[in-house]
């Protein structure tokens, strides 16, 4: 029985050590920069205004609409006036706050493919990897996507 207790304590110590090795602390402005979305068809620049963080599309893999031959527009937006604006430059991330625990929250994310806006939080998993969760109501009902940092 004594040997089993020792083995359990050693295993617990190894798990604790592994968890601490993998845990990284990031700074609030580590979010700033240019990120590639999961579909790899857009670059989003994350920037800061005051204490809040925002993100806008600065590059599209396919910026021209195949049907019109003109720059793609925000055609899925529910606001008819906003349907006329170019996709390039659309603000996707709005009003994110740093919570001090590798997470930015209290913000919204706009999905130009559906024209819908969702509550959202962002977790920095690694310096070059973001987990972005958009949701309606509670975060259990939503979608997660991952963005990678664009190397400059």
Regions found by a protein language model. Name each.
Residues 129, 136-152:
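Edge beta-strand at a domain terminus
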Residues 1-4:
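Positively charged n-region of N-terminal signal peptides that target proteins for export
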Residues 48, 98, 124-125, 149:
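Generic beta-strand structural signal
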Residues 109-128, 132-134:
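Acidic, glycine-rich flexible loop segments
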Residues 32, 40, 47-110, 117-119:
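Central antiparallel beta-sheet cores of small beta-barrel/beta-sandwich binding domains
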Residues 22-34:
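N-terminal helix-cap/turn-to-beta initiation motif at the start of protein domains
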Residues 40-43, 115-119, 133, 141-144:
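Short, surface-exposed coil-to-beta transition loops
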Residues 7-17:
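Bacterial N-terminal signal peptides
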């Amino acid at each position: 029985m004594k040997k089993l207790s020792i083995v359990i304590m050693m295993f617990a110590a190894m798990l604790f050590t592994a968890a601490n090795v993998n845990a990284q602390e990031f700074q609030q402005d580590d979010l700033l920069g240019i990120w590639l979305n999961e579909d790899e068809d857009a670059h989003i620049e994350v920037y800061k205004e005051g204490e809040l963080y925002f993100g806008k599309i600065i590059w599209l893999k396919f910026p021209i609409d195949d049907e019109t031959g003109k720059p793609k527009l925000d055609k899925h937006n529910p606001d008819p006036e906003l349907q006329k604006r170019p996709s390039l430059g659309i603000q996707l991330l709005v009003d994110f706050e740093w919570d001090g625990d590798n997470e930015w929250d209290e913000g919204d994310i706009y999905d130009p493919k559906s024209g819908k806006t969702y509550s959202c939080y962002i977790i920095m998993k690694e310096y070059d990897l973001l987990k972005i969760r958009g949701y309606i109501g509670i975060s259990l009902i939503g979608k997660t996507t991952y963005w990678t940092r664009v190397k400059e």
